[in-house]
């Protein structure tokens, strides 16, 4: 039997849904492993070209800087390595755990903490 090749589909995600995930992570979902600073006054103004989110990994001691494109990359990684969280996000049934996994995918390209 021939191996079936998967399809790749591109979808457009509204900015407010990405901001929802970011909010869930920053306001509770990821506070157990990270501290945050932002380059602009509004943490959620991801359209500002100077927007940068500094993420301090309190366990690992490293600091990471995220840009808008890292959010898109993180969402793609979320869909690949924790598809049930991605599915919850798409169905608008996401929670703080989904938001935390999203942020970890943005920062580490993996889910390191659980």
Give names to the regions the model predicted.
Residues 91-113:
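Short, compact, well-ordered microdomains
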Residues 6, 31, 35, 42-43, ...:
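Intrinsic disorder/low-structure terminal segments
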Residues 57-85:
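Acidic, low-complexity, intrinsically disordered interaction modules
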Residues 1-57:
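Long, contiguous N-terminal structural blocks used for assembly/anchoring
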Residues 24-32, 46, 77-85, 105, ...:
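Surface-exposed polar/charged interaction patches
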Residues 43, 47-50, 58-64, 72, ...:
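Intrinsic disorder/low-complexity detector
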Residues 9, 13-17, 21, 62, ...:
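Alpha-helix boundary/N-cap detector
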């Amino acid at each position: 039997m021939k191996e079936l090749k998967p399809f790749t589909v591109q979808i457009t995600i509204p900015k407010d849904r990405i901001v929802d995930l970011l909010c869930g992570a920053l306001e509770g979902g990821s506070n157990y492993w990270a501290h945050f600073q932002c380059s602009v006054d509004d943490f959620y103004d991801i359209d500002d070209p100077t927007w940068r989110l500094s993420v301090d990994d309190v366990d690992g001691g490293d600091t990471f800087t995220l840009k808008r494109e890292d959010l898109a990359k993180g969402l793609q990684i979320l869909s690949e390595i924790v598809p049930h969280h991605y599915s919850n996000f798409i169905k608008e049934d996401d929670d703080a755990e989904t938001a935390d996994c999203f942020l970890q995918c943005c920062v580490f390209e993996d889910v390191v903490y659980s």
